Regions:
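Sec-dependent bacterial lipoprotein signal peptides
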Residues: 1-16
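Membrane-proximal, proline-rich intrinsically disordered regions
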Residues: 17-60, 421-460
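Short, surface-exposed recognition loops and adjoining beta-strand edges that mediate ligand/DNA contacts
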Residues: 30-34, 57-72, 184-266, 378-385
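Conserved, well-structured interaction surfaces
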Residues: 41, 76-145, 157-163, 179-186, ...
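Inward-facing hydrophobic residues that define packing positions of alpha-helical scaffold repeats
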Residues: 103-106, 168, 175, 217, ...
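Flexible, polar/acidic helix-loop-strand segments at domain edges
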Residues: 287-344
Length: 460
C-alpha cells in the first residue's frame, strides 16, 4: 500500500507515491510501481532540481531579516522583523511547507534505492544524494524553527514536533551515512564527500562542537583541488554560467530551459523592478578599508563585483547578463547561473570561528584574508569579542546577498546570550524570541496544538 505524509501542503499529494515521483522529475514522469534501478539517476537529479527551487525561494531570507537591504524600485517595507513575527507569517509557512514536500520526496527516493536488488553506482548515488539533501533541508528548517517533526519515512500519521536536539541528531546521522555512499569530489555540480564534510563542519559549529567542526573543515581542506583565487574577476566568476572556479565545493547547476530560476531578478533585474538594494549605510561601509582592534585591511577584492556606485540601487553580485547597467563581469547565460551552496570560504570561516581567538584561529583568518585583500595585517592576539566581530564581518563581506547574515548573528547569539541584538539591528526592540521563527498556525491547527506546540514568545 502506498503511503505519503500528511503535513500541510502535502495533503494535496494523497493520489499516492506516483504523484510525488512525478513532482521530483521535471521531464520524465515514471509511474511509481514501475520504477527500476535504471530510473534512479533521474530520481536523483530530481532531488537536486527540487533543491534548486528551495534554495532560490529562501535565498534572501538571511539578508532581508538582517537589515542588509533597502527597498528596491519594485518593493517597499518598514520593519523587516515583523515579517516573521506573526504566527500567520507567509514566509514561515512557505519555508515550512516547501521543506516538508521535499523531505517527502527525499524519503521516497531513499526507500526506492534501499529496495533495489542491484544497481551499483546508481543506487549509491541515489542513497547518498537523498540523505545529503534531507540533511540540508532539515538544516534549513532547524536554523529557522528549531523544533520540527523528524520524518525519516513517509507516513499517513501526523508526526509530533521533536526537540531541536533530535533534529540536529538526524542531520548529523544523515550526513555520516551519506558519505558512505557518495564519492570524492569530481564536480561541484553533485554532492560529494567534501560537500558532506562542509555541511557537517557547519552542523558541529552550530551545535558548539568546535573540535569536530575543525576536524571536518580540515577533511575538506585536505583536498587540494580547492584553491583560492585572489582577484576581483576571480571572485565575480563564482556566480556566472559556465564557471570553473576552483573555490567551488558544491553548487546547484540550475541548467533549466523552463521554469528558470534567476537570483539576479531579486536585486539586479534588467527591467529595473527588483525588490532589494544594498542598505544605504552599507554602501560606503561594507567593503571599506578598516583599521580596528589591531586589524588593518585594505583593497577588498569583493567590492567591485558586488556594488557599483554608478548603479547604486543595484547589487551586481549576480550578473544579469545585460549591458550598460553597471555589471562588473559578463555572464554568458544569466538565467542558467549556478546556485552556490558551499565554497572554500565557507570552510576557512567555519574553521576560524571554531578555533576562536587562538593563534590557530588567527592563522586561519590570515590565510583566508590574504586572498581577499590587497593588504592585511592581523595582531598576534585578540579578545574573544574582537575576534568574533572579525569573523562576523568577514562572513558579511564574503556572503553578502547570499542569505547568511541573519543566521550568523543567530549563531553568535545562541553561543553567547550576552550578545546584544539591539546593537546589531536598528528595529529589533528586544524581540529576542524572533531568533526562532513561529510554527505556522495553519500547520498547528491541522496537526493539533498539543502535537505542534508554538515556539516561546508567540501568541498561542
Amino acid at each position: 500500500m502506498k503511503k505519503i505524509l500528511i503535513l500541510g501542503v502535502a495533503l494535496l499529494a494523497l493520489a499516492g507515491c506516483s504523484k510525488m515521483l512525478e513532482d521530483i522529475r521535471p521531464k520524465h514522469a515514471i509511474p511509481a510501481e514501475t520504477v527500476t534501478v535504471d530510473d534512479l539517476d533521474k530520481l536523483t537529479n530530481g532531488l537536486l532540481y527540487q533543491m534548486e527551487n528551495y534554495a532560490v525561494s529562501a535565498w534572501t531570507d538571511g539578508d532581508y531579516l538582517a537589515e542588509n537591504f533597502s527597498p528596491g524600485p519594485g518593493f517597499d517595507y518598514a520593519d523587516v522583523h515583523s515579517d516573521t513575527e506573526a504566527t500567520s507569517s507567509a514566509t514561515a509557512k512557505s519555508r515550512w511547507q516547501a521543506a516538508f514536500t521535499r523531505i517527502n520526496s527525499q524519503n521516497e527516493v531513499l526507500k526506492t534505492a534501499n529496495g533495489a536488488a542491484e544497481g551499483g553506482e546508481a543506487v549509491e548515488r541515489a542513497k547518498g544524494t537523498a540523505l545529503f539533501c534531507r540533511a540540508w533541508t532539515y538544516f534549513q528548517l532547524v536554523i529557522r524553527f528549531g523544533n520540527v517533526p523528524v520524518l525519516t519515512e513517509s507516513t499517513m500519521e501526523i508526526v509530533p514536533i521533536s526537540p531541536e536536539s533530535k533534529v540536529w541528531e538526524l542531520i548529523e546521522a544523515d550526513l555520516l551515512e551519506a558519505e558512505k555512499h557518495l564519492s570524492a569530489f569530481t564536480s561541484y555540480a553533485y554532492p560529494s564527500d567534501e560537500a558532506c564534510w562542509a555541511l557537517l563542519a557547519k552542523v558541529y559549529l552550530w551545535r558548539g562542537n568546535r573540535t569536530e567542526a575543525i576536524n571536518y573543515a580540515d577533511k575538506v581542506l585536505a583536498n587540494k583541488a580547492f584553491q583560492f583565487k585572489n582577484t576581483s574577476n576571480d571572485y565575480a566568476s563564482l556566480f556566472i554560467n559556465g564557471t570553473s572556479n576552483p573555490e567551488l565545493i558544491f553548487a546547484l547547476s540550475n541548467l533549466r530551459n523552463t521554469s528558470q530560476l534567476r537570483i539576479f531578478e531579486k536585486m539586479n533585474d534588467t527591467d529595473g523592478s527588483f525588490n532589494y538594494s544594498m542598505e544605504t549605510g552599507l554602501r560606503s561601509s561594507l567593503f571599506a578599508d578598516a583599521d580596528v582592534a589591531g586589524v588593518s585591511k585594505s583593497g577588498d577584492i569583493r567590492l567591485q563585483p558586488t556594488y557599483n556606485p554608478a548603479e547604486d540601487r543595484r547589487i551586481i553580485k549576480f550578473p544579469n547578463g545585460g549591458e550598460n547597467m553597471g555589471q562588473f563581469i559578463s555572464n554568458p547565460d544569466a538565467s542558467q547561473s549556478p546556485i552556490v551552496i558551499f565554497r572554500l570560504s565557507d570552510i576557512y570561516l567555519t574553521k576560524a570561528e571554531a578555533q576562536g581567538n587562538t593563534s590557530e584561529g588567527l592563522a586561519t583568518m590570515k590565510k583566508y584574508m590574504d586572498n581577499r585583500y590587497e593588504t592585511v595585517t592581523l595582531p598576534t592576539t585578540m579578545s574573544a569579542a574582537d575576534f568574533r566581530e572579525l569573523v562576523l564581518d568577514e562572513n558579511q563581506r564574503e556572503f553578502y546577498a547570499e542569505g547568511r547574515r541573519w543566521f550568523d548573528i543567530k549563531r553568535a547569539y545562541i553561543q553567547d546570550k550576552t550578545f546584544d541584538l539591539d546593537k546589531v539591528y536598528k528595529t529589533w526592540n528586544d524581540r529576542d524570541y524572533l531568533m526562532y521563527w513561529p510554527i505556522p498556525q495553519d500547520e498547528r491547527d491541522l496537526a493539533g496544538h498539543d502535537r505542534y506546540p508554538q515556539n516561546p514568545g508567540y501568541a498561542e
